[in-house]
Amino acid sequence: MKQETNTPNAFTSSELLQCDVSGATSPTTRTKGTRGGSEPRDGVLQEIGGVNAMPAATWGWLKMNQTKLELSDELAAAPAEAVEVEGLDEQFAGSADAFDAAMDAMAERFPERRTAAPGDAADRARITPETELNVPATSVYQAGAIKLEEELAPAEAFETGMGEAAYTYLAGHATKRIVIDVPAYGRATVTARVSGVDAAAAIAAIDVVARPQATLDLQIALDSPVAGEGVVGSVLRVCAHEYATVNVTCTQTLDDSWIALDDTGLFLDEGARVNVQHTVLGAGASATGLAGDLLGDTAKVTIDTDYLGAREQVRDFNYELRHRGRKTECEIDANGVLTGTSKKVYRGTIDLVHGCKGATGTERETVLLANKGVDNKTVPVILCDEDDVAGNHGATIGHVRDEQLFYLACRGLDQNAAEDLFIRAKLEDAALSATDERTRAAVVRLGNNLIDNFEEELA
């Protein structure tokens, strides 16, 4: 497989973040200087590589295998008030180690490892020096997958979508740690609101343990009610026990001067259900990653993503769902609009692991390109090591034709006004489907900053 050795042009938001596909995977630092015509700023940038990396890399020249973050070392820790928690009653507040303890206990629930298959330990033991040249080599991904399936307990195999380096940064800079432990047959509704603080990192670290047949509705709101620049984000870990249901809604309404980081990891036991809604509307640069381990039979994950890219904004997505249980299901749907000179990378990987008989996975993306200046990259991937499975993937890309723009121009709408129509439609949909009044108000605030008379016409 081709190795990545080039470093393409990077993107930046307030000189704090860049994206490329260089091979670096460990944090490094460099002095911050002038880039892209921006005013010089003193300080040091911390580079975090291997972010939102695809589990099985594709061609390096596509420049979409992974992302690199550059975050200022001078960002202060946001005050605790930057993260508000609503609805977390004492009966649902878990101990600090509740998630780790729950994952450790899964080793007893799932003691078995990979069943016999080509490339397993027994197969490798039969290889002799005389025959090894006749045996097909395994890729880096295949070797890692075999190790995961043969040797790693559920807790060791657990991962988040943005990767280990990004998780370490987010967890290490968490403004507030929230542990939600819903008892068996219980039901809880919890909201976490993260507000941007100028020159600071405001991050909510959330652990969720949903006991057997429990139900949790979790809303996460990332917003910037005051002017400034910095990092706003969340890192979420979910352990869903047998037949538990976890519904996660994350709405991001930051202004362009902010960076948004949203990292999620899921573990599903038998019959568990996790439904995720990502709504990405603002931030000059945003990175969203989600990884799910469907180890229990008949577990199901549903992901719906709505996004908007405008002006010079950058959107970066990575979804990885690993099917290990029998008759597991996943559905990934993404729908977005790109205008101006915005950029977007979408990676969606469904991994049908050996032994997941009867599993089905579907991923779809629909994106409207409203300007010829946008940069759109989409890579839906199906990895398969089982025969009795079904995997479906596809992407639909539409654009506004010149004759349509001419028609609008004849009626007094120039290119910018035409793009505002699509931006308004996406924001109106988000406002109407907001989970509560504060989230709706945040969408309206963002809309008012982008479009004239947004609130008046919405009403």
PLM regions and their residue ranges:
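Short, low-to-moderate order helix/coil transition modules at the start of elongated helical scaffolds
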Residues: M1-T245, C250-Q252
